[in-house]
Amino acid sequence: MTTIILEVDNHTVTTRFILLGFPTRPAFQLLFFSIFLATYLLTLLENLLIILAIHSDGQLHKPMYFFLSHLSFLEMWYVTVISPKMLVDFLSHDKSISFNGCMTQLYFFVTFVCTEYILLAIMAFDRYVAICNPLRYPVIMTNQLCGTLAGGCWFCGLMTAMIKMVFIAQLHYCGMPQINHYFCDISPLLNVSCEDASQAEMVDFFLALMVIAIPLCVVVASYAAILATILRIPSAQGRQKAFSTCASHLTVVILFYSMTLFTYARPKLMYAYNSNKVVSVLYTVIVPLLNPIIYCLRNHEVKAALRKTIHCRGSGPQGNGAFSS
């Protein structure tokens, strides 16, 4: 492997990073490769099936499932940004990544994480309108509003990532830095910079606070109102039916927010311990795998649509209804 070092303004600037990943014996590397490859392929398959089921079943042409299809699409790319490079590193002695490759991976990772935070908040708002204002739900959650909200999620994610990258990509990294992680993330990159990264840290902290705190407040406020509404329902069966419509989303929210908040609680110090890599695996690999399963287990409409989709794909083309509100 050839290392290219450039001298710019009295700084030694590297063009490559070393991802330390999960240093273990070769036999365990092969085992990890097999496990993570199976997890990656299964995640892609699950989310693709959900997208196909929502697209092909007219009964799922509702705002709730429109946002769910965006979540599935997002998570397919979310894992694709990280998993392929991680899988290659399990089998290769060369665990380096180019500067441009690292910045590209970081940009899309931040984009998808920020987009998911906002999307989960919008899905919580959708459940709030459906349960607390059921009569006005079709009037409020129109196709136009849903499209605008979904587009806004992606726009905010892209812009947040772009602003962060402007500051992080300008930092100098000396020699060939070793990143104590299995992918390029913000905190480990800030830790290996050979110049003062306080400005980039402050921008990252402020934007992270905005992207995490505001959606979290929306989620908490939405579910507080939902809970208050459910408790006022007189019958136990009615309460159970109302809660079942948002149980899947609430489970996904708790999983994603708890993992990411735990990981990024102390960004400057979090990579001092390898245990944080395990937590990162949970929200970058395991949570995207579990999300489709959670929605299938707790949502009878999704389960029925998936059965129909699998049956149709296996037995040949079937007629599908047109999209409706």
Curated annotation (Swiss-Prot):
InterPro entries with a match to the protein in the record: GPCR_Rhodpsn, GPCR_Rhodpsn_7TM, Olfact_rcpt
GO CC annotations on file: plasma membrane
Entry's localization field: Cell membrane
Glycosylation sites: 10, 191
GO molecular function terms attached to this record: G protein-coupled receptor activity; olfactory receptor activity
Swiss-Prot/TrEMBL keywords: Cell membrane, Disulfide bond, G-protein coupled receptor, Glycoprotein, Membrane, Olfaction, Receptor, Sensory transduction, Transducer, Transmembrane, Transmembrane helix
Disulphide-bonded residues: 102-194
Pfam families found in the cross-reference section: 7tm_4
Transmembrane segments: 31-51, 60-80, 105-125, 145-165, 203-222, 243-263, 277-297
Residue intervals annotated with topology Extracellular: 1-30, 81-104, 166-202, 264-276
Cytoplasmic side: 52-59, 126-144, 223-242, 298-325
Membrane protein topology class: Multi-pass membrane protein
Predominant localisation class: membrane
GO-annotated biological processes: detection of chemical stimulus involved in sensory perception of smell
General function of this protein: Odorant receptor.
Family under the similarity heading: Belongs to the G-protein coupled receptor 1 family.
PANTHER family to which the protein is assigned, alphabetical: OLFACTORY RECEPTOR
Protein name: Olfactory receptor 6Y1
Source organism (scientific name): Homo sapiens (Human)
